[in-house]
């Protein structure tokens, strides 16, 4: 199953861009809702993509919307950095990973600026994706909201399986009445979420995302 690791970023996105692109380590980039957008690639051309300073554009967007300001006395979470690591057993190629990463990012963050950078700097040379999502919602002007963060990983698992890749099933087979009674006698049935978390911890894919309870004002 693919592993999704979310990391909260604070401050400028310049630091994360330098980290992701230093030394020519980036295999490829995909950009959305910036001065270059992959969906307009034919009209914009490769030169426009190379010229896109996505970190500076994200910083400017947050400044324009005022989403850099502290929230309830805490430093602003200026961006989210998701590391999407495919299952090594899938032997995924870069093109397949790019399609999966872009589809997942746009499904959940279509109203945000997105930069995806791909690496293969691990022991087995397996490509993986670094997905950087700016905190400002371009449609509402509010900071990023993830009302159901568990859906981020659930959707990734479903999308992987739809593409013939390994993925954790989000469906549980029905239990027999006797098995259900036995589980209840042992402390009650475990929820699908608790089952998933137990397995995910073993796979080092536990998601922990802290979100505000309501949209924050500009």
Question: What is each residue range found by the language model?
Answer:
Residues 211-214, 218:
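Positively charged, low-complexity/disordered segments
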């Amino acid at each position: 199953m693919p592993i999704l690791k979310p990391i909260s970023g604070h401050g400028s996105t310049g630091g994360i861009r330098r980290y992701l692109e230093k030394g020519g380590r980036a295999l490829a980039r995909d950009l959305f809702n910036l001065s270059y957008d992959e969906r307009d690639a034919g009209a914009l051309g490769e030169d426009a993509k190379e010229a896109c300073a996505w970190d500076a554009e994200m910083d400017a967007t947050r400044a324009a919307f005022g989403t850099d300001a502290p929230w309830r006395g805490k430093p602003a979470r200026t961006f989210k950095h998701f590391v999407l690591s495919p299952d090594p057993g899938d032997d995924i190629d870069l093109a397949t990973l790019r399609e999966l990463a872009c589809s997942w990012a746009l499904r959940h963050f279509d109203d945000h600026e997105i930069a995806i950078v791909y690496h293969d700097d691990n022991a087995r040379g397996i490509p993986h994706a670094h997905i950087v999502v700016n905190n400002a919602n371009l449609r509402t002007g509010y900071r990023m909201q993830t009302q159901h963060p568990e859906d981020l990983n659930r959707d990734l698992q479903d999308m992987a399986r739809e593409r013939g890749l390994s993925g954790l099933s989000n469906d549980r087979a029905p239990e027999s009445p006797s098995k259900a009674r036995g589980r209840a006698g042992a402390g009650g049935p475990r929820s699908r979420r608790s089952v998933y978390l137990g397995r995910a911890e073993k796979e080092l894919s536990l998601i922990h995302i802290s979100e505000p309870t309501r949209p924050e004002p500009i």
